[in-house]
Amino acid sequence: MVGGISRTGWLVAAALVALLAAILIFMGRPPICPCGTVSLWHGTVQSNQNSQQISDWYSFSHIIHGFIFYGVLRWIMPERALWVPLAIAIGTEGAWEILENSPLIIDRYREVTMAFGYSGDSVLNSVSDTLFMVAGFLAAGRMRWWVTAALAIAFELFTLWTIRDNLTLNVLMLVSPVEAIKDWQAGG
């Protein structure tokens, strides 16, 4: 067992991540940044490399996804082996990554969020986003709930201050756009 997950659980997790990568490649997503480089971090939001590299400002949102999935799934199924809720979390995150890279959501991001030139994620970035979610999931299992909540709030405030965007604003702007928020974000 590693991190409270059995060998079987890790194999299931790896298979789900591999399936996500295969689906994204089948959808025509670029394996890596079309610019031809692979970077550990890319910090410029309004850039053709945003959502193309291993990590970026939105990696914090994926860690928060892991916090949320852990809390909800352990509450729903407290007696299940940890790999079961982890597999469900990976499947859910993977489904979002697939949807996020569909023309419907790419166009929606361009219309109503600060991601004016967004063209979707590279496969590398989507897989990395999923692995950041896994890290958040596993971290939440080792922290008290209030520490996890405080860290999520800190991540939200930090990214809001730094790039004028975060998970909360991203969801709000996708679901019910507010022109004043879009204007404020564009001013940053």
Curated annotation (Swiss-Prot):
Name the InterPro entries on file: DUF2585 (IPR019691)
Which branch of life, at top level?
Bacteria
Cellular component GO terms held in the UniProt record: plasma membrane
Keyword tags: Cell membrane, Membrane, Transmembrane, Transmembrane helix
Membrane topology annotation: Multi-pass membrane protein
Where in or outside the cell it occurs: the entry states: Cell membrane
Please classify the protein's predominant subcellular localization into one broad category: membrane
Q: Which residues cross the membrane?
A: 8-28, 57-77, 143-163
Pfam name, any one: DUF2585
HAMAP family linked = UPF0314
Q: What is stated as this protein's family in its record?
A: Belongs to the UPF0314 family.
Identify this protein by name. UPF0314 protein Sala_3154
